[in-house]
Amino acid sequence: MASEKILGVDLGTTNSAFAVMEGSDPEIITNEEGDRTTPSIVAHDDGELLVGKPAKNQAVQNPDQTIASIKRHMGEEDYTVALGDDEYTPEEISARILQKIKRDAEEYLGQDVEKAVITVPAYFNDRQRQATKDAGEIAGFDVERIVNEPTAASMAYGLDEDRDQTVLVYDLGGGTFDVSILDLGGGVYEVAATNGDNDLGGDDWDHAIIDHLADNFENEHGIDLREDRQALQRLTEAAEEAKIELSSRKETTVNLPFVTATDSGPVHLEQDITRATFESITEDLIERTVGPTEQALEDAGLSKSDIDDVILVGGSTRMPQVQAQVEDLVGQEPKKNVNPDEAVALGAAVQGGVLSGEVDDIVLVDVTPLSLGIEVKGGLFERLIEKNTAIPTTASKVFTTAADNQTSVQIRVFQGEREIASENELLGDFHLTGIPPAPAGTPQIEVTFEIDADGIVNVEAEDQGSGNAESITIEGGAGLSDEQIDEMQEDAEAHAEEDEQRRRRIEARNEAETAIQRAESLLEENEELVDEDLEADVNDAIDDVQAVLDEDEPEIDALETATEELSDTLQEIGKQAYQQQQDAQAGAAGGAGGMGGMGGMADGPGGAADADGDDEEYVDADFEDVDEE
């Protein structure tokens, strides 16, 4: 194993996955629960923050304190969620998920993991990318690279392909949709074009089923289940299960007993949904994938006949409706040799291997998904970097003032494809001052855009006459200062210590309860072989362990000590029982005049039980051309 690993992380809307290079191949890491994916869910329950499967398992009973699909809000200004008495930004919620991923990876690998490559939807804008990077830093990662999800998936796919080819990656996840076209060959992964919809994903198919079920129920009973948070959570889980079942079956039944109650008593929900009905109520959603796919082909200057292979990414691509649409759009059946839930994490691990030196001869050439520029006179959007430009990249353009004696300008940075600046996404703004007074049109102000390999933008403006310059690294309204990140890291670390204490307490309790069960079982099985004194010692040791367990907040050390003493006592049962068996067999053998009694050695009870019980789930420029009015 290399001395340093760079973790590949697919931070998904619905589920997350993580992987690392093992030799020449990327390998998915199983989490603490033994699963290959981790639900992207955080909840607050009884003073604790739960992450992943434990959070998902309690969602029905605790919907108001359960947060899912936070990825859809990454980079949103002033957006927070309440858990317990605290408010959390999307970055902080995502950091909790990443913190669990980091801890589980370290446990799996047996070493610290400080560095990560984290993926984002290809159509994420700069603010969303910066927010993702902030989340990684809050979780304690040194984020080595932000990589587009379809690009990462192509890297996982391309490891087994030697030929040059053009690949279309169709990525429909839980909350976002991306389509990218890449040229693969000679170890180079070059993105030709990308497009997508950041507000379209498997969650929307779930919501369509929820509305279908709720509308039918309301028509029959006059009750809108969507107004009851607990009933809505049950509907949400049932809708997701129905969607999954309808990917392999023609019909499924949704059965929710006691979903609500009236004055007459409890009311149950039981409805059949056919695949035909499901596809009918989601037809508008599948149609929304057509435009971005066709636009990506157009931007790449390709027709569907130029595509050699189609890769499906994201669990939502398992729906037959989606696969049929892709085949119709591209004219060929998609590849099925890439696991849609794992491909992105595997590709991120490959990129991590490239950065760490574990993987040679691979070059990733990604693109910026949207055009970047500034606002100029009249509110127009002046592009400096066009969409689908390979990154990292730099572009400059010279502007001037629009008023006499103008001594400052405002640079407003936008990202998007609309011609009117205000219709695009405002990423940030700053002022350049100290421009010597001069007639309009005289000053020469050079604006330079630089996009790094993570797709994060830096903008600089310099007055060429005076040499005055100002710059900004775009973080948007949701960007975090170093001080904020440090504070959140400290907060995350504090929770990590609490989590570790809870982990130890749970493990100690599990081992104690298992030891008691084993002791009682051994006493019963060996009742005739154990003398009264030893039986009394064992019962006393059991009582000591149980006494600690019965405390409101058992001391971990005390519980571990009592359990160890009980285990030591149990060894005596094995020894005593074994010795008595040997004595009995020796006597029998002596009477028979032979060695036949030796066969009994296979049945010694001393080592039959395992003290390790199963772990329970861990709770763990207005820059005009330039014009100042």
From Swiss-Prot:
The keyword S-adenosyl-L-methionine does not apply. It holds the Pfam family HSP70. Keywords: ATP-binding, Chaperone, Nucleotide-binding. Transmembrane segments: none annotated. GO terms for molecular function: ATP binding; ATP hydrolysis activity; ATP-dependent protein folding chaperone; heat shock protein binding; protein folding chaperone; unfolded protein binding. Disulfide bonds: none annotated. InterPro entries: ATPase_NBD, Chaperone_DnaK, Heat_shock_70_CS, HSP70_C_sf, HSP70_peptide-bd_sf, Hsp_70_fam. Residues 576-629 are annotated as: Disordered. The keyword ATP-binding applies. GO terms for biological process: chaperone cofactor-dependent protein refolding; protein refolding. Residues 611-629 have a biased composition (Acidic residues). Residues 588-607 have a biased composition (Gly residues). Residues 576-587 have a biased composition (Low complexity). SUPFAM superfamilies: Actin-like ATPase domain (SSF53067), Heat shock protein 70kD (HSP70), peptide-binding domain (SSF100920). Acts as a chaperone. PANTHER family: HEAT SHOCK PROTEIN 70KDA. Belongs to the heat shock protein 70 family. This is Chaperone protein DnaK. It comes from Halobacterium salinarum (strain ATCC 700922 / JCM 11081 / NRC-1) (Halobacterium halobium).
